[in-house]
Amino acid sequence: SAYCQMAYLQQYPDRCAEVMKVVADKVKEMDVDVIVGPAMGGIVYAYELARQTGKRAIFTERVDNVMTLKRFAIHPGEKCLIAEDVVTTGISSLETKRVIEENGGICVGITCVVDRTKPEAPSPIPIVASALKLDLPNYAPEECPICKEGKLPLVHLGSRKMKQEAKQTL
């Protein structure tokens, strides 16, 4: 069917800024202190959203496959808005919310460039703004029609389990 490779948008800073303006315009009146981007996909979007809204930008990252806040601090009571590239299931956002709350912050919602959530499986955290809503099917690897054709190799492009998978190939 289709795959949203958001890194392609990041190649063009001016276009990325235009897309994030759509999101920024929707959240500029929100009471937010910090924009938090889950690594890798959310870092650029968090930075750009923070730039356009005058907020602080930070990111979470995986250490031993666990989402953590390694390089920054969240102050107790700070209102944090998560900025994602694509939200399909909301799993990365849930991990990021956990990190925010463990550090004393308050998660006020998610923003994303592309919202791929389904009505029957909504995001566990409210999506307060997106630039685009796409209704694309989600497939288990063994059910993916593109994979079945054998024209493209099945590769994992997200950051989850990357370190674990790299160890298995060494």
Model-identified regions with their sequence ranges:
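PRPP-associated nucleotide enzymes
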Residues: S1-L170
